Amino acid sequence: MPNALKLIERRIIKPRLRRLKRWRYVTYGHIHVHYKDHLDGGGRTSGLNYLPFLRDLNLPRQQRVFEWCAGPGFIGFALLGHGFCDTLCVADINPEAIAACRRTVANNGLANKVAIYHSDNLDSIAPSEQWDLVVGNPPHFADSAPGELRFHDEDWNLHRRFFKTVARFLKPGGIIVLLENNCGSTAETFRGMIDEAGLSIIFVRGCEGRRTPYTRIYYIGIMRKGETPPAWIHLGNRGGAVL
């Protein structure tokens, strides 16, 4: 009975209560990004470390950026609002997160710059999508927070499926830069599945060689096997990026 009550609470009561919560917004550049607190999986805090990280890599302005596991799109809209890209694509499986993204697009007049997909991983992405840069703050744990979309990736299946399908959406020379958490993984956690998908790790920044007992954000840079890393990666390395 206790388990049944918990299931009712999680599937019925909490979703109804969440709909009553008020909308908030945070501003990145000229863009007001709308969200509710329960939709934030860290994009509004640690996710914004992408901005100085990519700036330190000397990233040139990108034509099109995709944010995987976007939630309300904090990272993607921040990159767009601060001039890191011309256009943006976001996707998430959570309909509430998609509603937040649509609210942001409508209220900021971004319909001609932003594409939004309600998608289980990349399953519902239009085949015509082509991205220069992919970013994402996906669930960071395979062994904790089961049932919590923002944090749990059972047996790393979400990551594995992503790596298997993302290459078709990358432009030639396109790059993936994922934000991960050393408390839940290391770069080696993903190396095998990245390799099996025909991709290659081109840099790792900020990762210890073991899982840590505390939160430690790190980044993995990934490309198709055989492709030459862009010049800005090498320029950024002289500024301190760790390969």
Residue spans of the language-model regions?
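Short amphipathic alpha-helical segments
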Residues: 102-103, 146-149, 189-192
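Mobile active-site "lid"/loop adjacent to the S-adenosyl-L-methionine
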Residues: 135-161
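N-terminal auxiliary segments of SAM/dcSAM-dependent transferases
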Residues: 1-24
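Class I (Rossmann-like) S-adenosyl-L-methionine-dependent methyltransferase catalytic domain
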Residues: 35, 83, 97, 144, ...
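Conserved SAM/SAH cofactor-binding pocket of Class I
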Residues: 46-127, 133-136, 142-143
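Core SAM-dependent methyltransferase catalytic element
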Residues: 198-199, 210-243
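S-adenosyl-L-methionine
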Residues: 24-55
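Conserved Class I SAM-dependent methyltransferase catalytic core
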Residues: 158-209, 213-216
